[in-house]
């Protein structure tokens, strides 16, 4: 084995020279230079400084403006809540551990940080699944005269949390475990060791199939059908230009969110799968650190995409920030988000 396994940890560094120490007790400077840990700390500080105000502002603006409380926006707000969990429960911990170059909070802190990171990522993924299904049902209309209402949104929210907890909670109760990964400053599911005492391999397979592959299949199926339907409807002019434009704008926003999710999380999932299928092989700490920390940027992109692509929300945000006045003078209410409930692009 090209790494060193201990109680509740696996360090990707051979202990032939006797330098490996527990990542819960000693700085890991034998894995990387001090400046590299400083870079990680600075990066986490940046994510916190951006992630908290952006996601909090998303929630606050929606509470302040009743016209933003639409069923589709409930799902988007769910993403903001998940991101705040990641920022407050995970990023602050990782910032502090990076400053000390080891996981100073011990196995319990590792469990909490790993749980919040996994929970936030899974809520984001399953929220995108719900958004994809909503787009498919509203645009493709497999069920005649179906409207995505408040009850459907609440059911979608419940699904995201149930599925996210079904992925993030098992390592806390004995099915797999959370351990420090990469440079040992953040925690994730143990892809590195078989750990038969906690049935680790079965959990990783379950996680990749149920909580990654199946959601991806659903998302790609829904958008494949959606693209075909929108093209057919546009070609036959079955709906007004205004309705088609509204649907395209909402769909474009959600598709960009999916693409951004893939950009952030596929590298991490790919590296994790490689490590799982090549346990004991030689790889350095940076190999997992870069995709792991890059995936954390997902806490920022969703609200940024939402703010940039939703004119109604952008106007409400400016009104809130400027004490009730929109400096752009644009108070248009009828926008993409408000049209989502009533738009009906029929299939060919």
UniProtKB/Swiss-Prot annotation:
The modification N-acetylmethionine is found at residue 1. GO terms for molecular function: 11-cis retinal binding; G protein-coupled photoreceptor activity; metal ion binding. This is Rhodopsin. Coiled coil: none annotated. Its main location: membrane. It comes from the Eukaryota. The modification Phosphothreonine is found at residues 335-336, 340, 342. The lineage of its organism: Eukaryota, Metazoa, Chordata, Craniata, Vertebrata. Residues 1-36, 97-110, 174-202, 275-286 are extracellular. GO terms for cellular component: membrane; photoreceptor disc membrane; photoreceptor inner segment membrane; photoreceptor outer segment membrane; plasma membrane. The keyword Phosphoprotein applies. A lipid is attached at residues 322-323 (S-palmitoyl cysteine). Disulfide bonds join 110-187. Glycans are attached at residues 2, 15. A motif ('Ionic lock' involved in activated form stabilization) lies at residues 134-136. It holds the Pfam family 7tm_1. Belongs to the G-protein coupled receptor 1 family. Opsin subfamily. Keywords: Acetylation, Cell projection, Chromophore, Disulfide bond, G-protein coupled receptor, Glycoprotein, Lipoprotein, Membrane, Metal-binding, Palmitate, Phosphoprotein, Photoreceptor protein, Receptor, Retinal protein, Sensory transduction, Transducer, Transmembrane, Transmembrane helix, Vision, Zinc. InterPro entries: GPCR_opsins (IPR050125), GPCR_Rhodpsn (IPR000276), GPCR_Rhodpsn_7TM (IPR017452), Opsin (IPR001760), Retinal_BS (IPR027430), Rhodopsin (IPR000732), Rhodopsin_N (IPR019477).
């Amino acid at each position: 084995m090209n790494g060193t396994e201990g109680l509740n940890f696996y360090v990707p560094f051979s202990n032939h020279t006797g330098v490996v120490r527990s990542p819960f007790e000693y700085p890991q400077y034998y894995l990387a230079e001090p400046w590299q840990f400083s870079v990680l700390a600075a990066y986490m500080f940046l994510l916190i400084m951006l992630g908290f105000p952006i996601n909090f502002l998303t929630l606050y603006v929606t509470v302040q403006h009743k016209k933003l409380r639409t069923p589709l926006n409930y799902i988007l707000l769910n993403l903001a809540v998940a991101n705040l969990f990641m920022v407050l429960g995970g990023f602050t911990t990782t910032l502090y551990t990076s400053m000390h170059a080891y996981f100073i909070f011990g196995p319990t802190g590792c469990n909490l940080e790993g749980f919040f990171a996994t929970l936030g990522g899974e809520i984001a993924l399953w929220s995108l699944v719900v958004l994809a299904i909503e787009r498919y049902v509203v645009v493709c209309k497999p069920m005649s005269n179906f409207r995505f209402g408040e009850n459907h949104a609440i059911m979608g929210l419940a699904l995201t949390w149930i599925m996210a907890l079904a992925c993030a909670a098992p390592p806390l109760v004995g099915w797999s475990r959370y351990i420090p990964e990469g440079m040992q400053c953040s925690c994730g599911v143990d892809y590195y060791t078989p750990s038969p005492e906690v049935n680790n391999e079965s959990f990783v397979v379950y996680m990749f199939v149920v909580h990654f592959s199946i959601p991806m299949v659903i998302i790609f199926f829904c958008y494949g059908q959606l693209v075909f339907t929108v093209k057919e409807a546009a070609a036959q002019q079955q709906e007004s230009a205004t309705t088609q434009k509204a649907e395209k704008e909402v769909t474009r926003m959600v598709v960009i969110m999916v693409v951004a999710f893939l950009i952030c999380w596929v590298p991490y999932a790919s590296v994790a799968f490689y490590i799982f299928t090549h346990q004991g092989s030689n790889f350095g700490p940076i190999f997992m650190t870069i995709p792991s920390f890059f995936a954390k940027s997902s806490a920022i992109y969703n609200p940024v995409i939402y703010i940039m692509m939703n004119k109604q929300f952008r106007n409400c945000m400016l009104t809130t920030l400027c004490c009730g006045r929109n400096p752009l003078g644009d108070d248009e209410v009828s926008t993409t988000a408000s049209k989502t409930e009533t738009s009906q692009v029929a299939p060919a």
